[in-house]
A protein has these predicted regions:
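Glycine-rich beta-alpha loop segments
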Residues: 1-57
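C-terminal binding/interaction regions
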Residues: 7-10, 82-145
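Glycine-rich oxoanion-binding loops at beta->alpha junctions
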Residues: 59-95
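Glycine-biased, low-complexity coil/linker segments
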Residues: 176-177
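Polybasic, lysine-rich low-complexity intrinsically disordered segments
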Residues: 160-161, 188-189
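Short, hydrophobic alpha-helical segments
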Residues: 149-157
Length: 190
């Protein structure tokens, strides 16, 4: 199971504490953490996941692997800048948003547009025309965020071609479960 954790690269100490706890709890539940791979919330969640033996994937905006925070196991360079937010959001079965700026807002939008559940801890509020129909699932603690994300991720169906990459007609699409299995095998080797 792959859970994205998103948030600002320059976060408050409270957001960093929440992210680190989320990372610890996700790793304890066997989830792979995917994030933008840089600092702030991304670094804190990776640090938390690594502290309990978890696997972390960082989708980096540039082409320099050395920009990844030290707790990223699998740094993936994209050269896409902020467009890599699509990859972060669509690679997950659920997304946990902690705080965040406009980059986080874009990841929330990509996830929601693609039917991926978003759980929010002190993050953006989205409603249309002042209505109370915020599609972000609000929680009050790291434990509640992880429990909700795991529960929803188990129900989230990975559809054929549900990938930010378009496979060629002659290739078979890689499903989220297959990526999770491959990452789990790699984790056992580490």
């Amino acid at each position: 199971m792959i859970i994205a954790v998103i948030g600002d690269s320059s976060c408050s100490s409270e957001e960093a504490r929440l992210a680190e706890t989320v990372g610890e709890l996700l790793a304890q539940r066997g989830a792979t953490v995917i994030c933008g791979g840089l600092g702030g919330v991304m670094e804190a969640v990776c640090r938390g996941a690594k502290s309990t033996g978890g696997l972390t994937v960082g989708i980096l905006p540039g082409q320099d692997v050395s920009t990844a925070n030290p707790w990223v196991d699998i740094p993936l360079v994209t050269g896409m800048g902020e467009a890599r937010n699509v990859v972060v959001a669509k690679s997950a079965q659920a997304v946990i948003a902690i705080g965040g700026g406009y980059g986080t807002l874009s990841e929330i939008a990509y996830a929601l547009k693609n039917g991926i559940p978003v759980i929010g801890l002190n993050t953006w509020s989205l409603s249309r025309n002042g209505r109370e129909d915020d599609p972000i699932i609000r929680v009050q603690s790291a434990a509640e965020a992880v429990n909700k994300a795991i529960s929803l991720a188990k129900r989230h169906k990975v559809r054929k071609n549900d990938s930010p990459f378009s496979p060629s007609p002659s290739s078979s699409p890689i499903k989220g479960e297959e990526i999770g299995c491959a990452l789990a095998k790699r984790r056992k080797k580490l």
